[in-house]
Amino acid sequence: MATYSSDRAFTDMVHHTLAIPKIYAHLNWQPYALSVEKATEIDMFKGIDYVFTNDGFKTVQERFREKKYQQYTDFTIRYRRDQNPLIERHQSEYYKMKAAYFVYGITNCLKEDIAPCTDFIKYAVIDLKKVYEKLDDGSILIQDNGKHFCQIVDGKMVCPVKYNTDGSSSFFPIEISFLVKLWGNEMLVAQKGFLTAD
């Protein structure tokens, strides 16, 4: 299992060497410098990793995966950490995330060998505010139903709660192609590789 520090090093490397030139530059989003204190505060309490500017501020939560996850067509949001001894930490990023956008990318390398890391196999920039609107109005449902993948049921996306094998936390997937099938491109700001028409 990867350690937090190795995960952080991988994420930082991908952000600087891939995401900035291959995603944000194409969107004309410019990095906005924050003090270390402010960056730490908004990360811990609002689930915001970075802030960009382009016709106002763009707040972003990032998640990058290694190439062994390339078969997946969804992005995941951490849900709960019920095994954490601190009750105030049971609710995970789903409950605290205030970022306006979620940037999810799958790289062409492994965490253990980042030298060949030159591109994204897939990435998506998701409008999280619109996703949360669909969660709030019941158009996207999170259910602990024992399923492995999201389904479309009666015009709604039903997403299962999944559990990490080490029991540390749960998460739920959101199928990117279902967002487009149900609501067009309104939630998808940019993408590569997640839709079959690429």
Language model regions located:
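Nucleic-acid endonuclease domains
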Residues: M1-T59, R63-D198
